[in-house]
């Protein structure tokens, strides 16, 4: 068996992914329940919230690529990069899943450099706000300045709602023929509750 059951009851085949089985609601739900850094954060912090952060850092015209740059992890998980280097077969599976997701949402599988740059800025910010202060030097973060705004981790339901809200904002902007502007951070509980009420429970789109 080379397939898995998705949150909506569909099927994702790792060997030959069916684009019709890739839904933004499944991606949002799964990423909202996957913790960054394989769970070694001071508080739960999801890949979904990380993805929204990256979508805000990139230029507006690349917001969708920023939001979905880790969308394949909804199907293959978020393996730590040092471990990926020891499991070459995983990278091939990851690349196949990413190619399918990118095609499904009209993205070039080769992401623009600004997405990688934004990912590194997000990493620097996450290290400052969420990881233990171990004093070690991360070469990948040399000369990288974290964002001024601190990260307030959201629970999985709020992160899922935030991801879907951001996706719909970007999609609406694309339909109008304009680039999506970064949306404000939902740091207030009332806004979080409103987002949850609006978007949690949506079916696949």
Regions found by a protein language model. Give the residues of each.
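Metal-dependent phosphohydrolase cores
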Residues: 1-205
